[in-house]
Each structure stands twice: as structure tokens, then as C-alpha cells.
Amino acid sequence: MSDEERTLVLLKPDAVKRRLMGEIIGRYEAKGLTVRAMELSTIDTKIARKHYAEHVGRDYYAALEEFITSGPLVAMVLEGRRAISVVRAMNGTTDCAEALPGTIRGDFGTEKNHNLVHASDCLESAEREIGLWFPHLV
């Protein structure tokens, strides 16, 4: 069984606004991951609700939706050895205040709700998310 995986990563509007795209993508590439697809776009609430379907209805969802639709983001598919766990480790914990130095959120994050990046959490999520953002890849 191969340990090559694909994962979806979003560089959220705060990463784009703060001009951190090159720095973040460079970190992924330096770790040996390959960008297989990438697109800059501003999403609407329909896509946000599909992407974050498991969060719709929770107390924090309205703020999440407002943030993720507030400006352009970068959606990309990264591929490589154990890509899902590698990317999640590189990103750091969701709450930037708790993220370790050396992680993307630990080095650049400013708050829990504006935490720069999203990454698929498992193979099933990766396939679902890649299908939503890049249907031609599934």
C-alpha cells in the first residue's frame, strides 16, 4: 500500500490579505509536497456551506462563514507522502495562541477564528473536499 496522499488546503482570506501565500506554499514545497492544482477565488455562502457542512448550525458557524467568504482565498491540492498528516502538523493547532513555533499558525497566526489555513483531516474528507473544489481531479 502506498503512503502517497492528496489533501485539500485552503489559504484563507487572512493569509491572502497579509500576503503570506508564497511563504506558506514555500513551506509545503520545502517539505516535499507537490502542488497538483491551485486556484484563487472568492467563494459564496453556498460553497462555504458545502465545504463546512459538518459545522453548519453550530454556534460559531455564522462567524466562520462570514470570514471565509470575506475575500479571496487560495484552494489547492497538495500531494506527497502522508500529505494529510504532514500538512496538519505543519499548520499547527487550530487556535493560533496554542500553536507551536515553527508551525504556520504558530509563526503567523493572530487569532483562533482567523487561523490562515484549512487542511483536510482524513482521507475521506480529502476526497470529498477535493471533489468540491476540483471536481476534475476525482
Curated annotation (Swiss-Prot):
The active site is at 118 (pros-phosphohistidine intermediate). The keyword Membrane does not apply. One of its GO terms (cellular component) is cytoplasm. GO terms for biological process: CTP biosynthetic process; GTP biosynthetic process; UTP biosynthetic process. Its cofactor is Mg(2+). ATP binds at residues 12, 60, 88, 94, 105, 115. GO terms for molecular function: ATP binding; metal ion binding; nucleoside diphosphate kinase activity. Pfam families: NDK. Gene3D superfamilies: Nucleoside diphosphate kinase-like domain. It is found in: Cytoplasm. Its main location: cytoplasm. Keywords: ATP-binding, Cytoplasm, Kinase, Magnesium, Metal-binding, Nucleotide metabolism, Nucleotide-binding, Phosphoprotein, Transferase. InterPro entries: NDK-like_dom, NDK-like_dom_sf, Nucleoside_diP_kinase. Its EC number is 2.7.4.6. It comes from the Bacteria. It catalyses: a 2'-deoxyribonucleoside 5'-diphosphate + ATP = a 2'-deoxyribonucleoside 5'-triphosphate + ADP; a ribonucleoside 5'-diphosphate + ATP = a ribonucleoside 5'-triphosphate + ADP. Belongs to the NDK family. Major role in the synthesis of nucleoside triphosphates other than ATP. The ATP gamma phosphate is transferred to the NDP beta phosphate via a ping-pong mechanism, using a phosphorylated active-site intermediate. PANTHER family: NUCLEOSIDE DIPHOSPHATE KINASE. Homotetramer. This is Nucleoside diphosphate kinase. It comes from Cutibacterium acnes (strain DSM 16379 / KPA171202) (Propionibacterium acnes).
